[in-house]
Amino acid sequence: MADLLSVLQDKLSGKNVKIVLPEGEDERVLIAATQLQKTDYVSPIVLGNEDNIKSLASKHALDLTQIEIIDPATSELKDELVDAFVERRKGKATKEQAVELLDNVNYFGTMLVYTGKAEGLVSGAAHSTGDTVRPALQIIKTKPGVSRTSGIFFMIKGDEQYIFGDCAINPELDAQGLAEIAVESAKSAQSFGMNPKVAMLSFSTKGSAKSDDVTKVQEALKLAQEKAEADQLEHVVIDGEFQFDAAIVPSVAEKKAPGAKIQGDANVFVFPSLEAGNIGYKIAQRLGGYDAVGPVLQGLNSPVNDLSRGCSTEDVYNLSIITAAQALQ
């Protein structure tokens, strides 16, 4: 994790990227905000009831003098954001509904990002994934050419660094969806200083098994390679289909996939389903001893990321750094 953060901090030096932290009344978030404010990487915007936040700061002896605090209930920005929300959600929300929704810190924070008053958002310490992601999908939406967002995890142990996806968002994926995730994961890898070698995973290696599931991954590989070329991605390798051992162990790749572009040296792994991805990252985390950083959401027009409700202050800090780096892409 230290190596990844060092790369990102070098990239962010002097940028003071504005990141919204909607859960300012959570002590983990508020402590992380004060730590971030001491850097020149991130300039946090904290949301919540100002009196409650100041009381929490006093309890933990935190200095808030340089931190921007916004209370959605009383903010002078509320009317502007309500109007922008109604316009964005044409025909899907009345002004009265917008006023009520923007009392919610996640909707308010997402509108700050949408209107350019902030560059990214990190939430989830006290909210579900749905509470964090839903406003982003409704307001920020996905990039042109991308039909869905997806969630990757950085799996880190010592000098080893891998990306696993999709592990968090899409329960059902067709070949087109897998292809999009492969290309977006490659872009994410590049933005975090990696040279992506993307393995499309299956229970088959290069046609060793036959089934509709294998065919889907094979079709996804072709679509991903075409999309990477159309997007003019350089220094990106996407290959498959591979069993996991053939993707990561050179001696196995030599036997199972001689001549493949990836010879046991993949660093980005695209799982064939959410089930497989979620199980896979947790096995690597719990049995393999890897730190799992994420989920980092990709495919949105602006970065929004989701914390676990069991997160630590360090998790909030680290994901804020990652979100700021995404904002510079």
Curated annotation (Swiss-Prot):
InterPro entries: P_Ac_Bu_trans, P_AcTrfase, P_AcTrfase_dom1, P_AcTrfase_dom2, Phos_Acetyltrans/Butyryltrans, PTA_PTB. Pathway: Metabolic intermediate biosynthesis; acetyl-CoA biosynthesis; acetyl-CoA from acetate: step 2/2. GO terms for biological process: acetyl-CoA biosynthetic process. Its EC number is 2.3.1.8. It is an enzyme of class 2 (transferase). It catalyses: acetyl-CoA + phosphate = acetyl phosphate + CoA. GO terms for molecular function: phosphate acetyltransferase activity. The keyword Disulfide bond does not apply. One of its GO terms (cellular component) is cytoplasm. Keywords: Acyltransferase, Cytoplasm, Transferase. It is found in: Cytoplasm. Belongs to the phosphate acetyltransferase and butyryltransferase family. NCBIfam families: PRK09653.1, pta. This is Phosphate acetyltransferase. The lineage of its organism: Bacteria, Bacillati, Bacillota, Bacilli, Bacillales. The gene is pta.
